[in-house]
Amino acid sequence: MPRSRINENFIDKTFSIVANILLRIIPTTSGEKRAFTYYRDGMSAQSEGNYAEALQNYYEAMRLEIDPYDRSYILYNIGLIHTSNGEHTKALEYYFRALERNPFLPQAFNNMAVICHYRGEQAIRQGDSEVAESWFNQAAEYWKQAIALTPGNYIAAQNWLKITGRFE
């Protein structure tokens, strides 16, 4: 049974109903509809922590989806799963790929910054301040891009940039 038919929580049900209505009234190809169904099922599985199932759905959505903008969100969600699994190198790769298709994803820049900041903290714990500084500088650049896209967001990042002298 497709995941879209077994959603149990109110928000998932509401999203599924609205999505199904939109799929019926908006002119789309059958491939686009199938891609969206896989994407929606991937989001549902991801929200329940079923990452393997979510990835299968996202990969199938990627195979079917041709629109770069829509593909950017699929890639972003794949990046989220890899981040959750601690696979930071893979996550960064997917965030980069998402941004290639849609450079207006502040959440991708933010997540990349968080990973770089985390790696900077790891380097400090390992006693390598030079490597840490490099990671922190990279985090700063990504946070600046996220903040430029959504100036009212990422207040903690803005504060970190100011405290560390990286805010221009």
UniProtKB/Swiss-Prot annotation:
Q: Does the keyword Nuclease apply?
A: no
Question: What are the protein's UniProt keywords?
Answer: Chloroplast, Membrane, Photosynthesis, Plastid, Repeat, Thylakoid, TPR repeat
Q: Name one GO biological process term.
A: photosynthesis
Gene Ontology CC entries for this record: chloroplast thylakoid membrane
Stored InterPro entries: PSI_Ycf3_assembly, TPR-like_helical_dom_sf, TPR_rpt, Ycf3/AcsC/BcsC/TPR_MFPF
**Pfam families per record:** TPR_1
Protein location: Plastid, Chloroplast thylakoid membrane
Note the SMART domains from the entry.
Answer: TPR (SM00028)
Tell me the membrane topology, using the record's own terms: Peripheral membrane protein
The stretches annotated as TPR repeats are 35-68, 72-105, 120-153
Please give the function described in this protein's UniProt entry.
Essential for the assembly of the photosystem I (PSI) complex. May act as a chaperone-like factor to guide the assembly of the PSI subunits.
Under HAMAP family, the record lists:
Ycf3
Q: Which protein family is it in? A: Belongs to the Ycf3 family.
Q: What is this protein called?
A: Photosystem I assembly protein Ycf3
Natural source organism: Phaseolus vulgaris (Kidney bean)
